[in-house]
């Protein structure tokens, strides 16, 4: 039995795209089917975990579908269907969709440099990635409301007592 390491990369900020989410979902489905894998460690390459959804580049949000929002959420839903335990290793910014990706994991381990934000209010749109369900469930409605309504960034050490991360490590 083993822990599988699943790394993703979309430099420089590891923005979430439909293609990136599809790749993660496909990899997680394969790992679910592998009886030798007990758990998955999800990590990003580079200094940033995921700085949000790619809303502007030609490879971003709407690049792969006539209904990009539907395609994006279809891939997000696939991530949440994983049966094996997932530990997210968050080494940098986890903003917007990046926060959602971290919350798709069962556990979150973060470096002191990690930053978390649900900055949707600053962008003028509704929180995505299932965050209106997952964030209050993990950190409680009061802290979730604070994150949603301010859009502020929080250091890993600040959100450890809230339960947003499970461990703080170098």
Model-flagged regions — what are they?
Residues 9, 44-45, 51, 91, ...:
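A secondary-structure boundary/capping signal
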Residues 13-14, 48, 125, 167:
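Short strand->helix junction
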Residues 80-170:
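Crotonase-fold acyl-CoA enzyme core
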Residues 22, 36, 43-78, 94, ...:
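Glycine- (often His-adjacent) and acidic-residue-rich active-site loop
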Residues 1-45:
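Conserved CoA-thioester-binding segment of acyl-CoA-metabolizing enzymes
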Residues 6, 23-24, 42, 54, ...:
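Terminal peptide-recognition signature
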